[in-house]
Amino acid sequence: MPLLISRFAELDLIRQPEQQDEPLQAFDAADEYLLSHVAETGLSLDSRVLVLNDSFGALAASLARHANVVSSTDSFLAAQGLEKNLARNGMAYDAVPLIPASEPLSGPFDWVLIRIPKTLALLEEQLIRLQGQLAPGARVVAAAMVKHLPRSAGDLLEEYVGPVQASLAVKKARLLFATPRPQEVRTSPYPTRYTLDEPAIELLNHANVFCRDGLDIGTRALLPCLPKNLGAARVADLGCGNGVLAIASALENPDAHYTLVDESYMAVQSATENWRAHLGERDVVLRAADGLDTQQPDSLDVVLCNPPFHQQQVVGDFLAWRMFLQARAALVTGGALYIVGNRHLGYHTKLSRLFRGVEQVAATPKFVILKARK
């Protein structure tokens, strides 16, 4: 893989999760453009730099030796990528403090460097949290590849920070420069809430939760197929989002034990609040993680999963395949994985390569619900 070369450093970077023969690199032209701008403008060792949504540490690791850098992300995998890439390039893995997007920021910051996220609600929430956190004369610069830069991203920067000027495109990347101006403190529109009929519960959703304004149709198809009469089974909701699958299952299975995991900190925050709202102090494990990567082998009886098909702007089934592998490792012999997937994705064939028995539990015109037994 090519090195990320800037005036600050030459870095050998890897993506997360690591894959053999990885076809994609861990940085892009938007990272290079942003680093070039910072170098041309000038940076001092005592500058406080906040990096938002750094994919795998390309920005924070490049600047780590040249300023007081803090990184905030909603992605556990991105946070893990930063730590691994710092260590990979001769720095302490914790050389850059990490702040999950679910936690408040602590300024003042002289620079704010933003990679525009796929979910603009996350960007909006991050900009709202910047209120009162900018030092006098602070510079706020956002970057994206042109094909992933909606006009509304600039509108949000203008609304919450100040006037925006766009750069020329370089190598199909563009920068947005926002000049901070005094303005009234704004109240966040997040979290949002919606109500289900069956089960009859209200669900809270922080800004970066998938389908935060209503139940996604895949989960809607899976809900009626959740297993019942589980007794004291150990159940994991893999990629839990706001926790709806685990909560619905737990309401039907009062003696079962649940683990909810997601790589989004805001998803885990939402799931935690929803669990407490509907199940009180009932024991549960909730964690931001790389799926079931740290789950003990043969420690689960059931895994529930509505697998994602993209990582930011990268689309593919590599995350789903990784989840299937993790589920197989974590399940006891005879344990079962329940998933929902688009018909065209061919999950039945993929699961048949990993599990001894795969059956279709239900189907809609768009989705299939599958049960795979180890």
UniProtKB/Swiss-Prot annotation:
Catalytic activity: guanosine(1835) in 23S rRNA + S-adenosyl-L-methionine = N(2)-methylguanosine(1835) in 23S rRNA + S-adenosyl-L-homocysteine + H(+)
The keyword Methyltransferase is assigned to this record: yes
Assigned keywords, A-Z: Cytoplasm, Methyltransferase, rRNA processing, S-adenosyl-L-methionine, Transferase
Source superkingdom: Bacteria
Any one GO molecular-function label of the UniProt entry: 23S rRNA (guanine(1835)-N(2))-methyltransferase activity
Compartments (UniProt record): Cytoplasm
Matching Pfam families: MTS (PF05175)
Uppermost EC category: transferase
Keyword Cytoplasm: yes
GO cellular component, one term: cytoplasm
EC number(s) given by UniProt: 2.1.1.174
Main subcellular localisation: cytoplasm
Entry function: Specifically methylates the guanine in position 1835 (m2G1835) of 23S rRNA.
Family note: Belongs to the methyltransferase superfamily. RlmG family.
The protein's name: Ribosomal RNA large subunit methyltransferase G
Protein species of origin: Pseudomonas syringae pv. tomato (strain ATCC BAA-871 / DC3000)
